[in-house]
Protein backbone atom coordinates (compact mmCIF):
# COMPACT_ATOMS: atom_id res chain seq x y z
CA UNK A 1 0.00 0.00 0.00
CA UNK A 2 1.44 3.40 -0.99
CA UNK A 3 2.34 5.83 1.75
CA UNK A 4 0.38 9.07 1.62
CA UNK A 5 2.65 12.08 1.36
CA UNK A 6 2.02 14.48 4.21
CA UNK A 7 1.21 18.08 3.46
CA UNK A 8 3.79 20.78 4.17
CA UNK A 9 3.65 24.53 4.61
CA UNK A 10 6.11 26.57 2.60
CA UNK A 11 9.30 27.78 4.23
CA UNK A 12 9.49 31.14 5.98
CA UNK A 13 12.52 33.23 5.01
CA UNK A 14 13.89 36.44 6.54
CA UNK A 15 12.15 39.68 5.58
CA UNK A 16 14.61 41.68 3.46
CA UNK A 17 12.99 44.98 4.39
CA UNK A 18 13.56 44.33 8.09
CA UNK A 19 17.14 43.21 7.44
CA UNK A 20 17.92 46.30 5.35
CA UNK A 21 16.36 48.69 7.85
CA UNK A 22 18.51 47.19 10.60
CA UNK A 23 21.62 47.48 8.43
CA UNK A 24 20.84 51.11 7.59
CA UNK A 25 20.36 51.99 11.26
CA UNK A 26 23.82 50.66 12.08
CA UNK A 27 25.39 52.18 8.97
CA UNK A 28 24.04 55.61 9.86
CA UNK A 29 25.87 55.55 13.18
CA UNK A 30 28.99 54.09 11.56
CA UNK A 31 29.01 56.83 8.90
CA UNK A 32 28.71 59.54 11.56
CA UNK A 33 31.45 57.95 13.65
CA UNK A 34 33.83 57.61 10.70
CA UNK A 35 33.25 61.22 9.61
CA UNK A 36 33.87 62.38 13.17
CA UNK A 37 37.23 60.61 13.39
CA UNK A 38 38.32 61.86 9.96
CA UNK A 39 37.31 65.43 10.82
CA UNK A 40 39.24 65.23 14.08
CA UNK A 41 42.27 63.77 12.29
CA UNK A 42 42.32 66.57 9.71
CA UNK A 43 42.14 69.17 12.49
CA UNK A 44 44.92 67.45 14.43
CA UNK A 45 47.16 67.44 11.36
CA UNK A 46 46.48 71.08 10.68
CA UNK A 47 47.44 71.99 14.24
CA UNK A 48 50.43 69.62 14.48
CA UNK A 49 51.72 68.44 11.08
CA UNK A 50 53.71 65.29 11.90
CA UNK A 51 57.35 65.24 10.83
CA UNK A 52 59.52 62.32 11.80
CA UNK A 53 62.01 64.45 13.67
CA UNK A 54 59.49 66.47 15.69
CA UNK A 55 56.34 64.37 15.76
CA UNK A 56 56.74 63.21 19.32
CA UNK A 57 57.58 66.73 20.54
CA UNK A 58 54.74 68.40 18.65
CA UNK A 59 52.08 66.12 20.04
CA UNK A 60 53.31 63.63 22.68
CA UNK A 61 52.10 60.10 22.08
CA UNK A 62 50.33 59.89 25.45
CA UNK A 63 48.36 63.06 24.68
CA UNK A 64 47.52 61.89 21.18
CA UNK A 65 46.40 58.52 22.47
CA UNK A 66 44.18 60.21 25.06
CA UNK A 67 42.54 62.40 22.43
CA UNK A 68 41.74 59.40 20.21
CA UNK A 69 40.42 57.44 23.17
CA UNK A 70 38.27 60.32 24.36
CA UNK A 71 36.68 60.57 20.93
CA UNK A 72 36.21 56.82 20.92
CA UNK A 73 34.50 56.95 24.32
CA UNK A 74 32.03 59.53 23.04
CA UNK A 75 31.06 57.24 20.17
CA UNK A 76 30.91 54.21 22.42
CA UNK A 77 28.44 56.10 24.60
CA UNK A 78 26.35 57.13 21.58
CA UNK A 79 26.15 53.55 20.30
CA UNK A 80 25.36 52.36 23.83
CA UNK A 81 22.55 54.91 24.06
CA UNK A 82 21.07 53.87 20.70
CA UNK A 83 21.65 50.11 20.85
CA UNK A 84 18.54 49.13 22.78
CA UNK A 85 16.12 51.10 20.59
CA UNK A 86 17.70 49.79 17.36
CA UNK A 87 17.70 46.19 18.61
CA UNK A 88 14.13 46.40 19.85
CA UNK A 89 12.85 47.84 16.57
CA UNK A 90 14.64 45.17 14.55
CA UNK A 91 13.41 42.35 16.79
CA UNK A 92 9.79 43.49 16.91
CA UNK A 93 9.67 44.21 13.16
CA UNK A 94 11.24 40.85 12.42
CA UNK A 95 8.88 39.02 14.76
CA UNK A 96 5.83 40.61 13.15
CA UNK A 97 7.07 39.92 9.61
CA UNK A 98 7.88 36.29 10.43
CA UNK A 99 4.55 35.76 12.19
CA UNK A 100 2.71 37.21 9.20
CA UNK A 101 4.63 35.10 6.68
CA UNK A 102 4.25 31.89 8.71
CA UNK A 103 0.56 32.55 9.34
CA UNK A 104 -0.02 32.97 5.60
CA UNK A 105 2.01 29.85 4.80
CA UNK A 106 -0.11 27.81 7.20
CA UNK A 107 -3.32 29.33 5.84
CA UNK A 108 -2.31 28.45 2.28
CA UNK A 109 -1.81 24.88 3.48
CA UNK A 110 -5.28 24.81 5.06
CA UNK A 111 -4.26 25.48 8.65
CA UNK A 112 -5.64 28.83 9.86
CA UNK A 113 -4.19 30.30 13.07
CA UNK A 114 -3.87 33.59 14.93
CA UNK A 115 -0.66 34.41 16.77
CA UNK A 116 -0.32 36.25 20.06
CA UNK A 117 2.77 37.34 21.98
CA UNK A 118 3.02 34.51 24.50
CA UNK A 119 5.40 34.41 27.50
CA UNK A 120 7.60 31.96 25.57
CA UNK A 121 7.76 34.30 22.59
CA UNK A 122 8.45 37.27 24.83
CA UNK A 123 11.38 35.46 26.45
CA UNK A 124 12.76 34.53 23.03
CA UNK A 125 12.48 38.12 21.82
CA UNK A 126 14.17 39.47 24.96
CA UNK A 127 17.08 37.10 24.36
CA UNK A 128 17.31 38.27 20.74
CA UNK A 129 17.27 41.92 21.81
CA UNK A 130 20.03 41.31 24.35
CA UNK A 131 22.21 39.57 21.76
CA UNK A 132 21.78 42.39 19.25
CA UNK A 133 22.39 45.11 21.84
CA UNK A 134 25.71 43.41 22.58
CA UNK A 135 26.61 43.22 18.88
CA UNK A 136 25.75 46.88 18.26
CA UNK A 137 27.77 47.99 21.29
CA UNK A 138 30.78 46.03 20.06
CA UNK A 139 30.99 48.04 16.81
CA UNK A 140 32.48 51.32 18.16
CA UNK A 141 34.69 49.47 20.63
CA UNK A 142 36.37 47.46 17.90
CA UNK A 143 36.45 50.40 15.49
CA UNK A 144 37.97 52.91 17.94
CA UNK A 145 40.63 50.42 19.05
CA UNK A 146 41.69 49.85 15.43
CA UNK A 147 41.58 53.58 14.65
CA UNK A 148 43.79 54.39 17.62
CA UNK A 149 46.42 52.00 16.28
CA UNK A 150 46.20 53.49 12.78
CA UNK A 151 46.49 57.08 14.00
CA UNK A 152 49.27 56.42 16.49
CA UNK A 153 51.38 54.57 13.93
CA UNK A 154 50.74 57.26 11.35
CA UNK A 155 51.79 60.13 13.57
CA UNK A 156 54.88 58.45 14.99
CA UNK A 157 56.01 57.38 11.51
CA UNK A 158 55.45 60.87 10.10
CA UNK A 159 52.95 59.72 7.49
CA UNK A 160 50.88 62.26 5.59
CA UNK A 161 47.19 62.89 6.15
CA UNK A 162 46.07 61.12 2.98
CA UNK A 163 47.79 57.84 3.78
CA UNK A 164 46.29 57.71 7.28
CA UNK A 165 42.88 58.72 5.95
CA UNK A 166 43.12 55.91 3.39
CA UNK A 167 43.72 53.46 6.24
CA UNK A 168 40.74 54.89 8.13
CA UNK A 169 38.60 54.48 5.02
CA UNK A 170 39.67 50.87 4.79
CA UNK A 171 38.68 50.31 8.42
CA UNK A 172 35.39 52.12 7.73
CA UNK A 173 34.65 49.69 4.90
CA UNK A 174 35.39 46.71 7.13
CA UNK A 175 33.07 48.08 9.80
CA UNK A 176 30.23 48.64 7.33
CA UNK A 177 30.64 45.11 6.01
CA UNK A 178 30.47 43.83 9.57
CA UNK A 179 27.17 45.68 10.04
CA UNK A 180 25.86 44.01 6.88
CA UNK A 181 26.94 40.61 8.18
CA UNK A 182 25.32 41.26 11.56
CA UNK A 183 22.01 42.31 10.00
CA UNK A 184 21.91 39.32 7.63
CA UNK A 185 22.97 36.79 10.25
CA UNK A 186 20.62 38.11 12.92
CA UNK A 187 17.69 38.23 10.48
CA UNK A 188 18.29 34.54 9.77
CA UNK A 189 18.49 33.71 13.47
CA UNK A 190 15.42 35.75 14.34
CA UNK A 191 13.37 34.02 11.66
CA UNK A 192 14.52 30.62 12.94
CA UNK A 193 13.73 31.57 16.55
CA UNK A 194 10.23 32.89 15.84
CA UNK A 195 9.31 30.04 13.50
CA UNK A 196 10.49 27.41 15.97
CA UNK A 197 8.59 28.99 18.87
CA UNK A 198 5.37 29.18 16.85
CA UNK A 199 5.69 25.58 15.67
CA UNK A 200 6.11 24.34 19.23
CA UNK A 201 3.12 26.40 20.40
CA UNK A 202 0.98 24.82 17.68
CA UNK A 203 2.27 21.30 18.20
CA UNK A 204 3.85 21.24 14.74
CA UNK A 205 7.00 19.43 15.75
CA UNK A 206 8.29 18.10 12.44
CA UNK A 207 10.05 20.01 9.66
CA UNK A 208 12.09 19.38 6.53
CA UNK A 209 15.45 21.04 5.88
CA UNK A 210 15.83 23.31 2.83
CA UNK A 211 19.25 24.46 1.69
CA UNK A 212 19.32 28.08 0.59
CA UNK A 213 21.46 27.52 -2.48
CA UNK A 214 23.23 30.80 -1.70
CA UNK A 215 26.62 31.68 -0.29
CA UNK A 216 30.05 31.40 -1.89
CA UNK A 217 31.15 28.51 0.32
CA UNK A 218 28.07 26.53 1.36
CA UNK A 219 28.39 23.96 4.13
CA UNK A 220 28.33 20.65 2.29
CA UNK A 221 26.50 19.01 5.18
CA UNK A 222 23.72 21.61 4.79
CA UNK A 223 23.62 21.03 1.03
CA UNK A 224 23.21 17.30 1.65
CA UNK A 225 20.51 17.85 4.30
CA UNK A 226 18.57 19.91 1.78
CA UNK A 227 19.08 17.41 -1.04
CA UNK A 228 17.91 14.57 1.23
CA UNK A 229 15.01 16.69 2.50
CA UNK A 230 16.15 15.71 5.96
CA UNK A 231 13.37 15.70 8.54
CA UNK A 232 13.87 16.76 12.15
CA UNK A 233 12.08 17.53 15.40
CA UNK A 234 11.98 21.33 15.76
CA UNK A 235 12.14 20.99 19.55
CA UNK A 236 15.56 19.38 19.24
CA UNK A 237 16.95 20.58 15.93
CA UNK A 238 18.44 18.74 12.98
CA UNK A 239 21.48 16.57 13.66
CA UNK A 240 24.17 17.89 11.33
CA UNK A 241 27.92 17.60 11.85
CA UNK A 242 27.41 16.12 15.29
CA UNK A 243 25.16 18.84 16.70
CA UNK A 244 21.46 19.63 16.71
CA UNK A 245 20.80 22.92 14.95
CA UNK A 246 17.97 24.88 13.36
CA UNK A 247 18.12 26.32 9.82
CA UNK A 248 19.58 29.83 9.93
CA UNK A 249 21.00 29.36 13.42
CA UNK A 250 24.70 29.10 12.57
CA UNK A 251 26.73 32.05 11.32
CA UNK A 252 26.19 32.66 7.59
CA UNK A 253 23.58 29.90 7.37
CA UNK A 254 20.69 30.98 5.15
CA UNK A 255 18.87 27.65 5.15
CA UNK A 256 15.19 27.35 6.00
CA UNK A 257 12.66 24.54 6.48
CA UNK A 258 9.17 23.43 5.54
CA UNK A 259 6.68 22.73 8.29
CA UNK A 260 5.27 19.20 8.04
CA UNK A 261 1.59 19.25 8.94
CA UNK A 262 -0.03 16.44 10.96
CA UNK A 263 -2.72 15.73 8.37
Language-model features: where?
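N-terminal leader/targeting and assembly helices and adjacent pre-domain segments
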Residues: 1-173, 261-263
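Acidic, glycine-rich two-metal-ion catalytic cores of nucleic acid-processing enzymes
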Residues: 170, 174, 178-263
Amino acid sequence: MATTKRKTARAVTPNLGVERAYKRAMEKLIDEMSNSFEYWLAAAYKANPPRMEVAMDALPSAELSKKVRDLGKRWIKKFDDMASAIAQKFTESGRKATDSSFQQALKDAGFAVEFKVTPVMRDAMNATIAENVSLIKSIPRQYSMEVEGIVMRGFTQGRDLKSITDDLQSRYGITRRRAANISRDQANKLTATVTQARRVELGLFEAEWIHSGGGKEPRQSHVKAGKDRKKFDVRVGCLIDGEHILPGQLINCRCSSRTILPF
